[in-house]
Amino acid sequence: MAPGALVISAYAVCPDVTATVTPDLKCPNERGSLLWVQLSPGRHRLGGSALAQVFAQLGDSCPDLDEPGSLESAFNVTQELLKERVLTAGHDVSDGGFLGCVLEMAFAGNCGVTVSVPAPPPGVT
């Protein structure tokens, strides 16, 4: 946590505590898939992030949500995947982007990672 950082927490009822995940990366048989759910595709805003801090910068554009409906859809899909026990871990990308997220998950899971990111299809940013 960065000096001067504000921590905000929230509480929500969890009807089934067994249908939850933690941020530590778990890869049975040393294989797995990471899903990056972009709530604002094409907008890679890292202002105020750990990545900006590493480079002694503040950044000029902090993470934001352009279309609230995308958050609702992603939340609902995530809840279904949790019920189906498909997800094994979860983490946000707001504090350093995709790379920061993967590193934090690997550190928490006490494991290394090899990541292959395919090129996006034409027209997707």
Question: What positions do the PLM features span?
Answer:
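Flexible beta->alpha loop and helix N-cap segments adjacent to enzyme active/binding sites
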Residues: 25-39, 45-68
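Composition- and surface-driven signal marking solvent-exposed, interaction-prone regions
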Residues: 21-26, 46-52, 90-93, 102-104
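Phosphate/diphosphate-binding loops
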Residues: 1-44, 115-125
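Glycine-/charge-enriched secondary-structure boundary and capping motifs
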Residues: 1-9, 58-63, 75-125
